[in-house]
Amino acid sequence: MHPEVSEPQADGATEPSLEESAGDHGRAGPGVRKEEINETKETCVGPSTTSCQSQKQQSGDSRLDCRSGYARNDRDDRGPRMTKEFLQKLCKQHKLYITPALNDTLYLHFKGFDRIENLEEYTGLRCLWLECNGIQRIENLQAQSELRCLFLQVNLLHKIENLEPLQKLDALNLSNNYIKTIENLSCLPVLNTLQMAHNRLETVADIQHLRECLRLCVLDLSHNMLSDPEILSVLESMPCLRVLNLMGNPVTKHIPNYRRTVTVRLKQLTYLDDRPVFPKDRACAEAWARGGYAAEKEERLQWESREHKKITDSLEALAMIKRRAEERKKARDKGETPLPDSEESSSTSPEAQDKPPLGETQQKIEVFVEESFKVKDELFPEKPGGEEELAVVEDRTMEEPDLPGSLAQSQTLLVATAEESTSSVAATDGTGTEDTEAIALETKERLFIDDLPDLEDVDGMDMSMEDQTKEMGIPKIQVISSLSDDSDPELNDSPLPMLEHTPTGSTGVLSNIFAVCKDSSKAVRVPLTDICEPRATTELETQGQVFSTTPPRPLIQELEEDGRGENESKPSLPAQSSEDGDSQLPEATLLGDRAENEAQSSLDLGKPSPRASLEDIEFGLD
């Protein structure tokens, strides 16, 4: 360390000695000075690094050489490479598949690569971006047999090579490189687009290989150094060429009437340089080739006249439509029927035009109806047990008319009361108790078809069914007796004669019922009136709605008339009321509060026994 610090002082000390020696030997010539300076330079050169660094600072040439050597070593050692790890990280960055074979696109542009390598695992690539790198050679693409697009623009390529594995390549971009000759492209059978702009193409021989590219449709040769007009012969031999770009080449100035000539010679061309080749341009160019500028001018005038005629025809058609619309509007304002257009009437009459649509609509309607019936048959096929279903449906239809007339009351009534009401109405029409039992059995069979026993058990169940009907008939007859006395005023006068004419089998039951009523008439009268008043009203309504024997208004009038008759005959009833309390029960149940008031008045007029009055007080004030 100490010698390194002392070295600058020694150098500083030696400098004045050199100057003094030079001053002392001032008389000596310049040759002596040069020799001394050279000797000092030679003494500085040595194995030590410090002497080498001082030498680099003194000589600029040696400094540049040293820097260039370091730069080459850095580029060889530290330059970006297409390693597998780098490619995997890149796939993660671009949200691609980590499995290499699953990726169809790989973005490797603007990375500074100088070689194409480590792409063997990426066998499913369809598009490979390698633009803006330092690639000097096309190589290592043997595994990319499915590649369609290869972008190698803005690189350091000098030659087209190693493209044989890319049999499905469709687009190749080699712009902005240093390629001097188009070659090795005939091995690409489906190549459609080739971009060779900004390269070093000069002569016809440089593009002669394009004759072998039979499927090439898009060719970009702009901004090269092509100057020979004979390149058109090469371009003519390309049967599928549609798009051509020769801008920026000297040949565009060397070919007279460049656009017309190229358009005429390339028959399939649709786009030249910066704009398309329209049919009008092609027709004018062909006319120019036939007869010069005069023929071209005439052809152009014809095209312009045709275009003008198309425009005028369209405007006239619009004006005609507007005029016809105004005429129709005027006719409608005047109340006249607008006449059809003359053109339409001459070609086809409106009736003939309207008939086919009407026929078609009718056919469509018929087809729709048939299809709807077929769908109905498929969805609702006829079943073997149709009779049973019909019975149930008839039963429901008989029950449905009761609903709209008595919605408020049907919410409080049960299904059993409805069935009993139907049976009671049938009994009050003048039929016997046997008929009522038969009707009850029929309704039960209709409503409970699913509950019927099997055919094997029918014989053993006959007696039990008869017993059940007898047992079930008893509460129905009780309800009939209670409701018929309350509901039907016409039957109030003669319930017992009907019972006398009944068969002997049922007289016992009915006599027992009425015997109970006679024994406990005073005790049961008030509860029956409270219970049977709403049922009596419902029975009257159901009788008027179901059987429609008498309309509601005449029925009310008859009730009022009966009430008036009873009021007129009330003075003769008090004696009977004291003797028999059953006669007061139908009056109270039929007329409600009004009947109760009349019964009370009759009781006051008749002056019944004290025992009867006490019982009335006990049971009447609940």
UniProtKB/Swiss-Prot annotation:
The keyword Cell division does not apply. Residues 540-550 have a biased composition (Polar residues). One of its GO terms (molecular function) is dynein complex binding. GO terms for cellular component: axoneme. The keyword Phosphoprotein applies. Disulfide bonds: none annotated. Residues 249-288 form the LRRCT domain. LRR repeats lie at residues 101-123, 124-145, 146-167, 168-189, 190-211, 215-236. Keywords: Cell projection, Cilium, Leucine-rich repeat, Phosphoprotein, Repeat. Residues 1-80, 326-360, 481-503, 540-622 are annotated as: Disordered. One of its GO terms (biological process) is axoneme assembly. Residues 22-42, 62-80, 326-336 have a biased composition (Basic and acidic residues). InterPro entries: Cilia_flagella_integrity, Leu-rich_rpt, LRR_dom_sf. Belongs to the DNAAF1 family. This is Dynein axonemal assembly factor 1. It comes from Peromyscus leucopus (White-footed mouse). The gene is Dnaaf1.
